[in-house]
Amino acid sequence: MDKEELTAWALANGWQIIAGWPSLTKPRAPKEAIVRMVFKATVVNLEVKKPAGKWEKVSGEAYGKVVADPETGRPSGLGFDSIPSFSMLMQDNKDRLMMERLNGGRKG
């Protein structure tokens, strides 16, 4: 998957662009990114924001090695399957964004 494919997947799965990167937010603070995908020239990194505010890389992979799962479409190689909290956070973000859209842009 390339940068555009990863971005399209992320936006369809509850991520939003914050400060130029596809990001997941805290459920209670929907404007503050706590997980982000950072695109470099040849690799994509998954970073998590530490409580002190510093970003820490938790995984990374060359674009050529990131492949969409044939059943779920989820990118492999970035740790989404090995860290269950990412799935829950993505679902929380996706649900919140859907509720905002249903409410005409207002927070649920």
Question: Language model features by range: what are they?
Answer:
Residues 18, 38-40:
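Short beta-strand micro-motifs enriched in acidic
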Residues 2, 28, 34, 41-108:
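Intrinsically disordered, low-complexity regulatory regions enriched in serine/threonine/proline
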Residues 1-30, 105:
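Negatively charged, low-complexity tracts enriched in Asp/Glu with abundant Ser/Thr
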